[in-house]
From Swiss-Prot:
One Pfam family matching this protein: Adenylsucc_synt
UniProt family annotation: Belongs to the adenylosuccinate synthetase family.
EC numbers on record: 6.3.4.4
InterPro entries found in the cross-reference section: Adenylosuccin_syn_GTP-bd, Adenylosuccin_syn_Lys_AS, Adenylosuccinate_synth_dom1, Adenylosuccinate_synth_dom2, Adenylosuccinate_synth_dom3, Adenylosuccinate_synthetase, P-loop_NTPase
UniProt GO BP: 'de novo' AMP biosynthetic process; IMP metabolic process
Cofactors, names only: Mg(2+)
Note on cofactor: Binds 1 Mg(2+) ion per subunit.
Gene name as annotated: purA
Any one GO molecular-function label of the UniProt entry: magnesium ion binding
Entry protein name: Adenylosuccinate synthetase
Enzyme class: ligase
Length: 444
């Protein structure tokens, strides 16, 4: 038995969906523990490309129980749309469970999110406009609507009548927007409640029962470490905790049940939205990475900013999450490059800095210190074993492992399931994989 957390080691969009999908074959339970429809993950199965925002990647395996945990915020309309899409494709959602204590994104959350971002002007933070921040704000202010509240018609009417009256004042006085009709919202969300009811459970109890039966549990994070509310590039962050520690709170489990943390990172770096990005590339190479990597957001369709691999934020992610091993994705995107640069440290006002600075202002002033390594100038998308990789590609992976000081367990070379090198099974294998320490580049 192994209970594993999968987290993003960069700014999100690292390819966690594919990695979670691969690992779900060995998992009995998959738990999404934070975030909402602001995060999207893409899974390619044969000729089908599935884009999901709330439903865990494990939904494709009928024997894998999929849980949307209490740390998430749920837009019922989007969730039910995903359920319908999957069922139209012949994929059952009978094994989907929803935490009764997860909070619900309401229409006023979306309106306030979009209006607030627009008011920021040049100081915008890059929100998706899906209402995530305001939903988490209401959760913190103890005025939010939870899934279990949807299941109580009389209580829901009472709550929403009061809440919408308050929100209408904000919409009118602060943003100049027309009021919401409380009766229409109550009717709409009461309808959602009946459709969701068969899936609603006490998720913490369900997870505990699985753990006591020694089931394999996979905890799936959304976004990435550098978007974490407490540990990311604040204020250009999300409103929840994507880091590994967030799995315990968002799923309702104790830290002692976590056996392993897998960090997912691209072979380069991307970021969507606003905020500092030291290794960002603006020329031809940045455009090549964007086009070859299809770097457009699953949720918003926004173009992702692209840059070289940043080992400083990588080491920070290892430290914050206690990462045991890495999954490196999109190695094939680098196939055509003559040489590749890796940021090994920063220069801040003439001083070398090997660690991630907490201040956004300091981070914005960081100049990357690069080490240049040779490219391999040949396709890697067909490789299925380490021995199949060009020597320069293998050397690149070794270099990343040395810089991050953790082993590499998985290498992804394309969107399809089979375009993957499994160096070591992160769930059932020992904690070794590709490990390089003290400058030793031999596999252990």
């Amino acid at each position: 038995m192994a209970n594993v957390v999968v987290i993003g080691a960069q700014w999100g969009d690292e390819g966690k969906g594919k990695i979670t999908d691969l690992l779900s074959r060995s998992a009995d339970v998959v738990v999404r523990y934070q975030g909402g429809v602001n995060a999207g993950h893409t899974v390619v199965v044969g000729e089908q490309t599935l884009k999901l925002h709330l439903i865990p990647s494990g939904i494709l395996y009928p024997d894998t129980q999929c849980i949307i945990g209490s740390g998430t915020v749920i837009d019922p309309k989007v969730l039910l749309g995903e359920v319908e899409m999957l069922e139209q494709l012949g994929i059952s959602t009978d094994h989907l469970l929803i935490s009764q204590t997860a909070h619900v994104t309401m229409p006023y959350h979306r309106l306030i999110d979009q209006a607030s971002e627009q008011q920021r002007g040049s100081h915008k933070i890059g929100t998706t406009g899906r209402g995530i921040g305001p939903t988490y704000a209401d959760k913190s202010e103890r005025t939010g609507i939870r899934i279990l509240d949807l299941m109580d018609p009389e209580g829901l009417r009472e709550q929403l009548t009061w809440t919408i009256a308050q929100k209408n004042v904000i919409l009118d006085k602060l943003y100049g927007l027309p009021p919401l009709d409380a009766e229409s919202v109550i009717e709409e969300y009461s309808g959602y409640a009946e459709r969701l009811r068969p899936h609603v459970v006490d998720s913490s109890l369900t997870i505990d029962e699985a753990w006591r039966k020694r089931k394999n549990i996979l905890f799936e994070g959304a976004q990435g470490t550098l978007l974490d509310l407490d540990h990311g590039t604040y204020p250009y962050v999300t409103s929840s905790n994507p880091v590994a520690g967030g799995a315990c709170i968002g799923a309702g489990v104790g830290p002692t049940i976590i056996d392993r943390v897998i960090g997912v990172a691209k072979a380069y770096t991307t970021r969507v939205g606003e905020g500092p990005f030291p290794t960002e590339l603006h020329g031809d190479i940045g455009e090549l990475l964007c086009q070859r990597g299809a770097e457009f957001g699953t949720t918003t369709g926004r173009r992702r900013r692209c840059g070289w691999f940043d080992a400083v934020i990588g080491r920070y992610a290892v430290r914050i999450n206690g990462i045991d091993c890495l999954a490196i994705t999109k190695l094939d995107v680098l196939d055509d490059l003559d040489e590749i640069q890796v940021c090994v440290a920063y220069d801040i006002d003439g001083e070398r800095c090997d660690h991630f600075p907490s201040s956004a202002r300091s981070f914005a002033n960081c100049q990357p210190i690069y080490k240049t390594v040779p490219g391999w100038k040949q396709s890697t998308s067909h490789c299925r074993n380490l021995e199949d990789l060009p020597k320069a590609a293998l050397d690149y992976l070794k270099f990343l492992a040395e810089l991050m000081e953790v082993p590499i367990a998985i290498v992804s070379l394309g969107a399809s399931r089979d375009q993957t090198i499994i160096v070591e099974d992160p769930i059932h294998g020992p904690k070794r994989a590709l490990l390089y320490t003290n400058g030793d580049s031999s596999a252990s």
